[in-house]
Amino acid sequence: MAHKKAGGSTRNGRDSESKRLGVKIFGGQAIRAGNIIVRQRGTQFHPGFGVGIGKDHTLFAKVEGVVKFEVKGAFGRRYVSVVPA
């Protein structure tokens, strides 16, 4: 009568899949319309000239040009713009 005592349970053993967030195109780099610039949760970066924002707060280029990051305003908001080349 070979019996095996029940193994103990554990509270570990799971992890969420990474969401691949962050800046995809950096300042000074060339970009084409429709390309993703930043994937983010909330508005860490705000859209400036030539940049649109998706429903998940993804920033994307609306025009072709060069990416520019800048800090503006009294609250020190970070803006991303696309300067036409």
Curated annotation (Swiss-Prot):
UniProt key word Ribosomal protein: yes
Region: Disordered, residue numbers: 1-20
Name of this protein: Large ribosomal subunit protein bL27
GO cellular component: cytosolic large ribosomal subunit
TM regions (residue ranges): none
Family of the protein in this entry: Belongs to the bacterial ribosomal protein bL27 family.
An annotated Gene Ontology molecular function: structural constituent of ribosome
PROSITE patterns referenced in this protein's UniProt entry, alphabetically: RIBOSOMAL_L27
Source organism per UniProt: Azotobacter vinelandii (strain DJ / ATCC BAA-1303)
Presence of the UniProt keyword Membrane in the record: no
GO biological process: translation
InterPro entries for the chain: Ribosomal_bL27, Ribosomal_bL27_CS
Domain of life (superkingdom): Bacteria
Keywords of the record: Ribonucleoprotein, Ribosomal protein
